[in-house]
Amino acid sequence: KFNKKNRGFEGLAWKADDRMLFVAKERRPSKIFIYQLSPDLLSVKQATIPEELNDIRINDISGLAFNNESLMILSDESRNLLKFNLTEMSFIEMLDLTKGNHSLTSDLPQPEGIVTLSDESIYVASEPDILAKFVPNK
């Protein structure tokens, strides 16, 4: 049975090259934890979190994804997708997931899942039964 005041872990992302696991705490406060796994993946230690990554200006975190050197941070309540570059330690892009932006004909009502592909396309899953695709400008 789930607690109605669920504020726990909400998203995971994996950076295979560095064996780093990113874990998102949904809210109060929204926070991202980073864990470094050993080469055999049998032990783990918490990694230092960049200050810039803790300065997230969104209401909640509903999903994470990793692509190239960027961590994608999805917010259900803010209806935004933030892109944080781990090399430059800065937020480099934001997608507004509301009507009129990026060819959306309506708001994504409850974006909760995200995946990025090697061509940098982004898929966002939203309740009820919506799958939106975003293609980067070339």
Where would I find each of the regions flagged by the language model?
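Sequence/structural signature of beta-propeller domains
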Residues: 1-138
